[in-house]
Amino acid sequence: MHRRAGSSRQIDIKLISCIRCLSQTILGCMAAIHANLEKVQPAFKNGGGVAWGDQSTCMFCAVARFFRPGYQNHLVSEWLPALDGVVVKLERGARVADVGCGHGVSTMLMAKAFPNSEFIGYDFHPSSIEAAKAHAAENGVSANTRFEVATATNYPGKDFDLVAFFDCLHDMGDPAGAAAHVCQSLKPDGSWMIVEPMAGDRLEDNLNPVGRLYYGASTMVCVPTSLAQDVGAALGAQGDEARLRAVITAGGFRNVRRAAETPFNMILEARP
C-alpha cells in the first residue's frame, strides 16, 4: 500500500499495476472481438453459438494477456493462501488440475511457486494446449507441468488435491456436469477453486465500469461459446454468486464459500 503525502487515502500499488496492464490488454481483446463479428452476428439471429475453436485466431492469446495481470498479482500471494490448507499441501507436493487452462498462464504461475507439486493443464482447444506446452518450456516449468487436450467433463484422474477453474466455468456448455466431474476427480479432502468474474446478484449491482466490460465481452464471446456446446447453459460472465453456488452444489459439493475477491474476480472454494 502507498499513502500520498497529506492524504488519508491509501492506494494499492498492485491494483494500479494490474489496471495499467489491463488497459493495454483490453485493446487486444476488443480487436479480437471485432474480427469475429461476421461469425457472431448470425448466432444472434438464429439463436446458435460460436465454437471457441472458431473464434478469431488472435482471441486465444488476447484472452491470455487479458487475465495474466490479475493472476500474476493475486494468484500465489492471495488466492491460494485463502483456501483451506491448500498451500501446505502444495509446498509438500500435491497433484493439481488446471481445467480450461488455455495458454497455461495460471498453470505456470502455480508451478513456479510450488516446484514440489505436479500441475496438469487441461483444455478442449488443441491449439491452446500446444501453445501452453511451448510457454512451459520457455519458462522452465516443464519438469512439473504437463498439458493435455480434455474437456471439463472427461479429463482423467480421481486423486487431485486441488482442481482449479480460472475464468472459464461460465463459458462451459454444461457447468453442472463439469462440477459433478470435478467432485469425482478430487481426493476426499480436496478443494475446487473457482475463479469467476466479479458480479453482484442483481443487475443494478453490476452497472459499473467492470460490469459493463464483462457484459460486453460476455455477449460477444462467453455466451456464444457456451451455446455452441452440449446443454448450452450460457451462464455468461456476469453470472451471479447465487447462480454459481447452485451449479456447484448441483454437482455434489456440500461446502461452498467465497474465499477471496478483487474488483475483477470472485474466488470460490468448494469442498465435497
Language-model segments: residues:
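A short acidic, Gly/Pro-enriched loop at the edge of an enzyme's catalytic core
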Residues: 153-163
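A short SAM/SAH-binding and catalytic strip from SAM-dependent methyltransferases
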Residues: 161-175
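C-terminal alpha-helical "lid/dimerization" subdomain adjacent to the S-adenosyl-L-methionine
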Residues: 195-250, 257
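Class I SAM-dependent methyltransferase SAM/SAH-binding core
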Residues: 95-97, 109-153
